[in-house]
Amino acid sequence: MSDLARAFDHGKAFIVFLTCGDPDLETTAAAVRAAAQNGADLIELGIPFSDPTAEGPVIQTANLRALQSGVTTDKIFDLVRELRRGVTIPMVFMTYANVVFSYGTERFLSNCRDVGIDGLILPDVPYEEKEEFLPACRRYGVDFVSLIAPTSENRIAMIAREAEGFLYIVSSLGVTGERSEIKTDLASIVSLVRENTDIPCAIGFGISTPEQAKKMADLSDGAIVGSAIVKLLAQYGKDAPEHIGAYVKEMKDALR
């Protein structure tokens, strides 16, 4: 079993997304620790990019704040190395192909292994292009996490059959961000995924309330929340980790 799959060993998983370096790396570290201590099962660390096409305005702005704070990929690797002295839950990077290419794919994934990153999510890399990254991911023991958006049954089945770690099911087409309601027929997507793989699946994009998180986790194996947490960072800055801890506890309690 991959380390990522272990995040789903203790019931429904609550997965937290944070943009590294927003507002600074010290706050990111404190926020990750607060999330882990309050029940987060897996952390997605966003490596900021100047053109984050999958993101809505909340996370786009977080990317800009992080880049303006002087964050670099090397500094983020140092951050993870430091976090791994105490944080034991799985962690994945979520970023864009250009970030990996410009750093050097082999070097990037070798460093992922060395610092303790368990998986990689690249939302701008479609299924057909994942071979550009998959061999290096496998060489260094880093799961390449696939996203499934509302699409044809054949495509969902094809992606599910080759999935690694866990599957990230996108609740609705479009960019990340909170939504008042989610109308996609997610039950059918999850059912199709489960017919084709034993790998756990979690739903993200648009989840912000305990009620939404419970509904999504009841359908799948977990819920992923990003924009609502990034909003806390925008609102409270360096004081956000305390608020993030309380929010994570409330959300995780809703999944128990």
Show where each model-derived region lies.
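Catalytic cores of alpha/beta
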Residues: 25-35, 151-161, 203, 207-223
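Active-site beta->alpha loop and helix N-cap motifs at the rims of alpha/beta catalytic domains
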Residues: 47, 60-122, 255
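Alpha/beta catalytic cores of nucleotide-metabolism and tRNA/nucleoside-modifying enzymes
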Residues: 76, 191-202, 208-256
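Hydrophobic faces of well-ordered beta-strands that scaffold small-molecule active sites
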Residues: 14-18, 43-45, 91-95, 120-122, ...
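N-terminal amphipathic alpha-helix/helix-capping segment at the start of soluble metabolic enzymes
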Residues: 1-18, 81-85, 256
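Active-site-adjacent beta->alpha loops and helix N-cap segments on the catalytic face
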Residues: 1-7, 50-59, 71-81, 101-107, ...
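Glycine-rich phosphate-binding active-site loops on the catalytic face of alpha/beta enzymes
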Residues: 41-51, 117-121, 126-129, 171-177, ...
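Glycine-rich beta-to-alpha transition loops that act as phosphate-gripper elements at the mouths
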Residues: 19-24, 94-102, 126-127, 147-151, ...
